[in-house]
């Protein structure tokens, strides 16, 4: 009879320090999001799955734990999925049940979603991608918290450089004898040049249980927080539209985050006060080697109070 191998992971570690997260990353699964009266959306999703580890245990049984994780994910993705954050919550809760030495389980999911839409001026069919972000954390004796959100790309224009160009245009028009009222009307109707950036907006909402927000509504708030939306396919009228819209709506990186805050408050006024909203904006500078970044993390109640006080 073969001798059973020792369970090394269950032994005492050399250093008795607990770990907040131990697990696996880069777990790829096909996920189908069910839709009523339509074909499901198929995602190639990548998961990160973690549990906490008490100070008296050396490891988490990585190989066996991976099998548990894989089986749990497979069970979850076989069932009809309407909200990916709910799926993450279910997986986290199952993992917590199957690990008697852990008190917290976290599941994070990232996936790329292809959007079909039309260009703004010529109505050409076009496609673009967004990154879906979903996660959940299950804890003993506490409601599971779920998060849903997206990373999107858009365009921004710097108000400062635009203002300098407007002043240059104002002086030149005055030198040419154009009246002050005509100059003012021209500058109002024809936004002046400013250096542009490709903007990256991230917007997520986390709440106890289901955040109860529509993913595509979150995407719209994030895209509209920048100076203009962008499109992969574009005829000249579409290029003109994007250029005009972005310059007529010039924004600093800080403005984009504040626009997201206002959009969340207006679009999701049903959210609980303790829902956590994360808003990030990163702009790829066109005239500098560095980039610009701004962000805010706040509970919805605080965000609503701040947005309301500014009206």
From Swiss-Prot:
Pathway: Cofactor biosynthesis; 5,6,7,8-tetrahydromethanopterin biosynthesis. One of its GO terms (biological process) is tetrahydromethanopterin biosynthetic process. Gene3D superfamilies: Urate Oxidase. It catalyses: GTP + H2O = 7,8-dihydroneopterin 2',3'-cyclic phosphate + formate + diphosphate + H(+). Keywords: Hydrolase, Iron, Metal-binding. The keyword Hydrolase applies. NCBIfam families: GTP cyclohydrolase MptA. Belongs to the GTP cyclohydrolase IV family. HAMAP family: GTP_cyclohydrol_A. Homodimer. This is GTP cyclohydrolase MptA. The gene is mptA.
């Amino acid at each position: 009879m073969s001798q059973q191998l020792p369970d090394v992971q269950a032994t005492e570690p050399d250093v008795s320090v607990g770990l907040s997260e131990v697990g696996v990353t880069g777990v790829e699964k096909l996920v189908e999001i069910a839709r009523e009266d339509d074909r499901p959306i198929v995602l190639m999703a990548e998961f990160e799955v973690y549990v906490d580890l008490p100070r008296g245990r050396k490891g988490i049984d990585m190989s066996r734990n991976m099998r548990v994780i894989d089986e749990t994910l497979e069970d979850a993705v076989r069932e009809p999925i309407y909200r990916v954050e709910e799926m993450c919550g279910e997986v986290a809760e199952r993992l917590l049940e199957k690990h008697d030495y852990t008190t917290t389980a976290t599941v994070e999911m990232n996936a790329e979603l292809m959007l079909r839409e039309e260009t703004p001026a010529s109505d050409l069919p076009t496609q673009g991608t967004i990154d879906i972000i979903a996660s959940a954390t299950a804890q003993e004796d506490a409601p599971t918290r779920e998060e849903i959100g997206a990373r999107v790309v858009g365009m921004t224009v710097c108000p400062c450089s635009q203002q300098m160009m407007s002043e240059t245009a104002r002086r030149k028009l005055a030198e040419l004898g154009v009246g002050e009222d005509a100059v003012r009307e021209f500058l109002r109707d024809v936004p002046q040049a400013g250096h542009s950036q490709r903007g990256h907006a991230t917007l997520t909402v986390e709440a106890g249980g289901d955040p109860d927000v529509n993913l595509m509504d979150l995407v719209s708030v994030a895209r509209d927080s920048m100076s203009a939306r962008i499109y992969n396919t574009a005829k000249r009228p579409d290029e003109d539209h994007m250029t005009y819209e972005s310059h007529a709506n010039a924004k600093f990186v800080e403005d984009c985050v504040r626009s997201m805050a206002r959009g969340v408050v207006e679009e999701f006024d049903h959210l609980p006060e303790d829902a956590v909203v994360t808003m990030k904006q990163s702009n790829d500078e066109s005239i500098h080697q560095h980039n610009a970044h701004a962000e805010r993390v706040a509970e919805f109640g605080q965000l609503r109070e701040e947005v309301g006080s500014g009206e």
